Amino acid sequence: MKDMGRKARRAATVLAVMSSEQKNKALEMIALSLEAHSDEILRANHQDLLNATQNNLTVAMVDRLKLNEVRLCTIIDSVRQVACLPDPVGQVMDEWTRPNGLHISRVRTPLGVIGIIYESRPNVTIDASTLCLKAGNAAILRGGSDSFHSAHALHCALVKGLKKAGFPKDAIQMVATKDRGAVGEMLKGLDGAIDVIVPRGGKNLVARIQVDARVPIFAHLEGLCHIYIDQSADLDMARNIVLNAKLRRTGICSAVETVLIDRQALEKFLPILTALQKKGCEIRATEDIVFLMPDAKLAFEEDWSHEYLDAIVSVKTVESVEGAIAHIKRYSSGHTESIIAEDMEIVEKFFNHLDSAILLHNASTQFADGGEFGFGAEIGIATGKMHARGPIGVEQLTSFQYHIKGNGQVRP
């Protein structure tokens, strides 16, 4: 593992000075290599899916793991989208001239070596690698055992693309073992080789990393997203948004887990809950809702803080936007919250009083995604308050330097 760290550090010094044209060529070579090896990648994924069935993984977990031609094409498209993004390295973030004539610029620079620890999503292999590459960083990947074959097939194709572009193969390395001890070694930083760790996985994985990491991390513990439906909301709009936010893909961190409804308009919005039930979604709700919907289950305290990642949703009535804000402040993970309302004063209050990384108005929580933000792809979502917050794209994978130019100044 420490040898991987040394190799990554050497590769990072090469990547840091690569031109935009060189990096974009490498990304195109990676896309072409993924296309050329798509059959091998899908066969490897099929093996992971067979193992998942034998290991009794949930439907949501299998969906996270699954690749098909459409999803693989989406991954390949995302590589080309990253190539089209502006190169952050060398961008002047700000500049000014001091009274003594010194000209000071704050300039974006690569972070160095990024450690990516993830579980069952094969696409993270490519998303993380290409974003790191675009930002001039080397990466060390450690995928989960569920996606072991898929991740390695994707990485193999990626490295072939790197070689064709003349890039060091050690720019993107993958830990070739399922041994969990490798994660512990990465969390120690590999003797100073790793600059940042980005975890992408379940609550237990991220919690362990947050406790054990000896290097900085960009992470969120869980999704636990909320939608508040105000009495001023349009019923049809609210129904479409809630159905999408819950059921488009239930197993992703931006899926809504709790819906809060303005108590004064409960009967107006009951058709939303009926529509969810018709789609096979289980409703766990407060007593006033269960009274009107006998098929719904009574919610318990633990439901408000539970990330289901399944076709289950908690529903609660609240006294206006103030009640929604109070509930979200108590239970939110700080990931994503949405308000459906036509009253802009209510919307402004919602936005001004909540501190989650992403706030939406009249839109599905499932837009909490780097691709939807125009970032091309994302490594993950960060809910901390450092410079990387929300979707982690190429800009968030950079640091900065101060470049100071003078003409002989000395300090008095």
Swiss-Prot record:
Belongs to the gamma-glutamyl phosphate reductase family. One of its GO terms (cellular component) is cytoplasm. GO terms for biological process: L-proline biosynthetic process. Pathway: Amino-acid biosynthesis; L-proline biosynthesis; L-glutamate 5-semialdehyde from L-glutamate: step 2/2. It comes from Bartonella henselae (strain ATCC 49882 / DSM 28221 / CCUG 30454 / Houston 1) (Rochalimaea henselae). Catalyzes the NADPH-dependent reduction of L-glutamate 5-phosphate into L-glutamate 5-semialdehyde and phosphate. The product spontaneously undergoes cyclization to form 1-pyrroline-5-carboxylate. This is Gamma-glutamyl phosphate reductase. Its EC number is 1.2.1.41. It is found in: Cytoplasm. It catalyses: L-glutamate 5-semialdehyde + phosphate + NADP(+) = L-glutamyl 5-phosphate + NADPH + H(+). Keywords: Amino-acid biosynthesis, Cytoplasm, NADP, Oxidoreductase, Proline biosynthesis. It comes from the Bacteria. NCBIfam families: PRK00197.1, proA. Its main location: cytoplasm. It is an enzyme of class 1 (oxidoreductase). One of its GO terms (molecular function) is NADP binding. The gene is proA.
